[in-house]
Amino acid sequence: MSLFNKIVKEFQWGQHKVRLETGEIARQASGAVLVDVEDTVVLATVVGAKSAKPGQDFFPLTVDYIEKTYSAGKIPGGFFRREGRPSEHETLTSRLIDRPLRPLFPEGFYNEVQVVIHVLSVNPEVPADIPALIGASAALAVSGLPFNGPVGAARVAYVNNEYVLNPTREQIKASRLDLVVAGTERAVLMVESEADQLPEDVMLGAVVFGHEQMQTAIDAIHELVREGGKPEWDWQPAPKDEALNARVTELAQPELLAAYQIRDKQARSTKLKEVYAATSAKLEEEALAAGTVAADKATVGNILFDLEAKIVRGQILSGEPRIDGRDTRTVRPIEIRTGVLPRTHGSALFTRGETQALVVATLGTKGDEQIIDALEGEYRDRFMLHYNMPPFATGETGRVGSPKRREIGHGRLAKRALVACLPSADEFGYSIRVVSEITESNGSSSMASVCGGCLALMDAGVPMKAHVAGIAMGLILEGNKFAVLTDILGDEDHLGDMDFKVAGTAEGVTALQMDIKIQGITKEIMQVALAQAKEGRMHILGKMKEAVAGANTQLSEFAPRMITIKINPEKIRDVIGKGGSVIRALTEETGTTIDISDDGVVTIASTNSEGMAEAKKRIENITAEIEVGQVYEGTVLKLLDFGAIVNLLPGKDGLLHISEIVNERVKDINDYLKEGQQVKVKVIQTDEKGRVRLSAKALLNEAAGQTDTPPQQ
């Protein structure tokens, strides 16, 4: 009898064969599923605590996606030779998996849940993120935890005007779209995408196509659960205290209504804190008078939050003005200033209402490119975008330090939005780093980073293909009634049902991200949201074009200049020298940065034009070929009885025979030449062994109008 009750489900999914297994590995976890997609293998596990911690008032879900280097047949680098802190890719994939899972846990479920996905084997052509998301969904489904799944996911490419399901890496490179969509049988929950200025209908079509295709995976998970699922947990939400709800509503509703008539964020926030504090204090006072225990502040806070949501959502659905007085389609006032920082290469201050981004662009050389050691192999990235949001941006105190998951995710979204409109490396050879410092935040700071990033790049002289703007949309959905909100505030994000971010140019979409807090939305709602987002984006693009018509034609005086020369690839080793000695001396002595590609393209960069010219001259000398008939100013290295060894170029010497020094007979060479002396010579012969014969006499004869003496054999 086997130790294992192993259940296996296999299905064909697009061009890939998928295998789901449970019951053999990680049996002590609440749920564990092994997913194999054409040799990319992931193990997804989930463990749920049997009870919530006392006083817990939020859902503590953690998702960790971990890539093991052995999966690609590698040993980790570093002193310890083991995996360390998560890479940016691992962090982004963890967020990608978390986002569609989180809204499917029932309200009031506060037990700690941890989802861990290990990448165990990698086929370089099959990205592991979709198998990981499918595995996490399946592990939750078989665990018996209260979870309204399963979730399916799919990657969609757009090649030759056709959608491609779960493309290979090579197909992704040729595609104008890289879109990941996740959802349930009924609706879409999450979208993450990067596109090359595609129209809205193509983007929507990709989402719908992905949702249709993921049903195959959802069906397979259902079958796996039927045969290998654990019993469902007997969990019920804590009963609501209707009396407490009624009393909190009675005490706080008038004050909350008044607070949401205040248009200024800081003043409104102060008023809301006062309402929360006063309500809790009044309830404690009443409990003390009655000799009972007061409701804990977390419970009261949750009731007040629900009451806030009801007020704000009700006002919007009934056609009343939004929190800050706008209607559903209006973008907040925009102010733009470029060239803000005098010594940076490019900078912009982009302000939209109470959201503000100070964005800086820096130009570098090929040596500044980011080297990324991925499972699929090492590669370089010439464009970096980093997003920072310090606590002062929201008027709060807090930790300052390394970027959190949210900051990494927002930075990647802004990067996705801009990368399609960057010039190619052939057009603009610089590496580029954009840093967005969020100095104020009240909603949609990632989209402010897109707008500010585009403006900072143009200020730096980067020839962008087009202006790029981004906008965040919200949704209020109650039954069959819904309202799509343009340019959402932070409070509308917290109290609403959707965060839908769209970035692009006047031609089309470059990035789209959608997160749904309810159990999915329909195609019709997405259609309305995309159309309204385009309207808002065009408005912002108009403001940006008014402020900055196009990229600066001159780079900042503080940015490095570049020149490019082509050398014989066989001469690369001469420029580098033994152990890098030659190129190291070149860069140090000329104050330049020198990059050499395998095809012999040499890029010299410096803020000093004289240093660049000197480096160029020296490289040309190192790689130059000695030609018969050329005249050189050489240095006498060594005197011999029969002539002198003369250095013509770095590493290239020739023989000046005693008979080629002057026309008369030379008895003692020391009468004519000394070591270290500069002498002008002409190349009169070279042979297949690289030996070079020189003549000074030939130049004397030419000056006197005589013909050259024939070279000696």
From Swiss-Prot:
Involved in mRNA degradation. Catalyzes the phosphorolysis of single-stranded polyribonucleotides processively in the 3'- to 5'-direction. It catalyses: RNA(n+1) + phosphate = RNA(n) + a ribonucleoside 5'-diphosphate. One of its GO terms (molecular function) is 3'-5'-RNA exonuclease activity. Mg(2+) binds at residues 493, 499. Its EC number is 2.7.7.8. It is found in: Cytoplasm. Residues 629-697 form the S1 motif domain. HAMAP family: PNPase. This is Polyribonucleotide nucleotidyltransferase.
